[in-house]
């Protein structure tokens, strides 16, 4: 499992796409209280 934490909202789509392009089959996005996001791949 690999996570990138505190991703600004404007970059979430790019990070998710990068993970998918790299072969990830499961990508989870969770919002943090400070309006950044954590993106995790399995």
Where do the model's predicted regions map?
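Short glycine-/aliphatic-rich beta-strand segments at the starts of folded cytosolic domains
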Residues: 1-5
């Amino acid at each position: 499992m690999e996570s990138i934490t505190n991703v600004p909202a404007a970059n979430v789509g790019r990070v998710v796409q990068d993970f998918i392009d790299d072969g990830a089959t499961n990508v989870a996005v969770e919002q943090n209280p400070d309006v950044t996001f954590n993106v995790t791949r399995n």
